[in-house]
């Protein structure tokens, strides 16, 4: 399998590190962000000004984490480090200085793979894309259809300032969406004279109307302006000049209350062509005057003033982990500041030390809240390595300070020309989040300001210069250049061949001669995201299907024996490597020891490097993480070489599925509507078998009647059921368990009231004290089975942290091998998905001229209407590759090598395969790409030739085992008394409004009546019905549903006198059948569950 297609060599530029976004951001936080926050925070003075507390941020230090990554996962702990910072307390009266190192909280650390471990679970902080601070100019239409312009100054934090024009050519200003104020009133309040303003404007005649309007209102001095400002901003409070002065100062000129941020200052300077230094983060008079000037130029349409496009990526920036965490630390420190000030006031001035003042709790709480419950801190998707990698590169517009799903319109979700090479136009979810959650393109990176950049080669007089490093441009810099796509054809010297080149210039497409091209894109793949770039022949697929293909690759279950694709795109190796699933050699050297658990590499100096491998660990999604060595003892290795395969990897490449022989033809209706017909070979040879590891947990708690006990002595259980339990009552590792088997024996003490009357009678007669415990053991749920692979016991004595009230926690891990079966979902890489409808014996499958039965039969009607023809190219290229015994890498967008290149390449490969001895039948020029198949049942040929070939097919995580569910009786909701919903709650199937209509339409009155009463929430009726069924009697008449009683009670609680009456006008008492001692329901029929159960 050494050969490779011609197409790979030219375009596969090496991608940058794909998790860099996460790592670089966290590194910035540790080196700069945290220090910045600690230093901005000091000094803190008490209310009298006697004491000052300084934080010396640059001297903070982190202690070694208490647990390493593996230990933290095992113990359900957080992988975090303690933060200490030097504090200086200065007593102004005595001049005394106390310096001390103070503990300020725990900071979760990022693992090498860009994740965090919080309470034992791996989490990812998703990057957020938000509107950049700065100044924005927009136009709106007023009621009369006249265009008005407005300018908004948006800070990083603080009050918004919005300038507007109106039909009378007056300028107004709003602060934080309050009432309109004449703009000149604000100028005068800021202490600017009329001449100061007029000198700065290029067209003062427009502005003079606003000055006149201010004079007419009688606001001619600074004091009057401040009073007016105070009245407008704080209506209802007595205005004062000093109040106005303070209000204006704190709103816009106090660095603690108003901050443009580095980015905001950069954007304002750039838009208004100012040269204010980076360190000035508040508003200046110059900013305000330049904004007004620019707005007037817009209104008069002079001076090259342009409107801003809010969806342009030059106006949206990415907030990664570091910045989100920095904001959170700021919140914690602000809470801390209040506490310190109070303690300074209350404490004895002389004896105070910094350690007494600083309480780590608020900071710890803020950081914990961010990692534990922020919308952007997500449980990592670990289904396979690609899912993990994509999750770390995700960019979300949701979250705190971002958009909400309901508010986001079409414009925000749409693809924008500036996304080109920065955000993937294809990979986004289907449904309500479409366009709000994006994926970073393959070559994109985030710069210091948070803008997304993408790389280009410089073009000089028509020659592409590919020396040195490529040049990275952000969206607004790129607008000023003419950029050609990555697939322009060039000759050996790098000169562009064509006469006219399509280029992008200022959001538009035009054609120019090669001399005018400024930059050319690095590679055709740089437009799309990592998942999309793994789809071969992507350019032949419709975008909607490519989207499904990208998303479904992330749901592929790692198989027992992974197989890398016959037809790939050349990026498989890098995806596997950057996902962190494969161990990589850090040094040049020799492998000196290998076994299943560890690989030792000895470098040239003779020191050993140990790589321990993960064996059968459970991932967040219950799939299996396992690493297998691929080097042997004595092998030489180089830096960056892959030492072992992870899950869903083979030979250091990502391998999400299997290459199987596929035929496109209908077969007895079993592949109608996207269903899939598969051969028994896939089951027998374990091609699509995967390992899943379930975690079961039980805790022994302290109850009012005494402690629960984990034990082997369980009442009323036969000895053979306890055969696999050890002396503590915990299952042994390696035991095979079926549904209903006991995993951990547990007994709970029961009180007097728990005993049924017959037991009380027995005890009264015989006087024996039966053991007062009931069986509360952990059992294997229905439909589950497997082998116990691990048991973990946590107790307080071992120093484990347990939940409150628990004395002991036992966890049992059960692994199961799942073969493929009817009802499982499978998919190709081109969005061609389906459900398995039947598994056919090998001998009944259609077979090739050489007798090979096909593995999968797909419906040919799935291709034309969906326009994902890429699957057909992949099929035939795979067919050629398997016959030539090689693997092929095809880079997407191959038209740069000539028109219809895909077609030509595939045909050439097929012809080459057919030229091999004995393989003439592989390619038939009369019917290219099709073969005459025979029916496996009769041996007769089908009447039409069929497209056959090898395709990479995936088994997705939507397995029928996890979905199939049935219920006879089970838990009911407490208020409505209706059965719960969902498999996890052992719930029933919902009979909704539309289903009721259907039954009504057929007049099926009795069926409907029992569905709405005894099968649902008529409590007495369902008990009686169950009783009647058990005893074989006729089922009695249904009563009143509980939900009707709830409705009555709700209406009565509104004060409405509502009741149910008979024809004779007698009121019916709906509550008569309610047992006065309703606390204990009649036992065996149902159990009610509290409302907390429903929320799950």
UniProtKB/Swiss-Prot annotation:
Disulfide cross-links: none
E.C. numbers: 2.7.7.6
Gene name for this UniProt entry: rpoB
Subunit structure: In cyanobacteria the RNAP catalytic core is composed of 2 alpha, 1 beta, 1 beta', 1 gamma and 1 omega subunit. When a sigma factor is associated with the core the holoenzyme is formed, which can initiate transcription.
Name of the protein in its database record: DNA-directed RNA polymerase subunit beta
GO molecular function: DNA binding; DNA-directed RNA polymerase activity; ribonucleoside binding
Keyword GTP-binding: no
Superkingdom classification of source: Bacteria
Organism lineage: Bacteria, Bacillati, Cyanobacteriota, Cyanophyceae, Synechococcales
Enzyme class: transferase
Main function: DNA-dependent RNA polymerase catalyzes the transcription of DNA into RNA using the four ribonucleoside triphosphates as substrates.
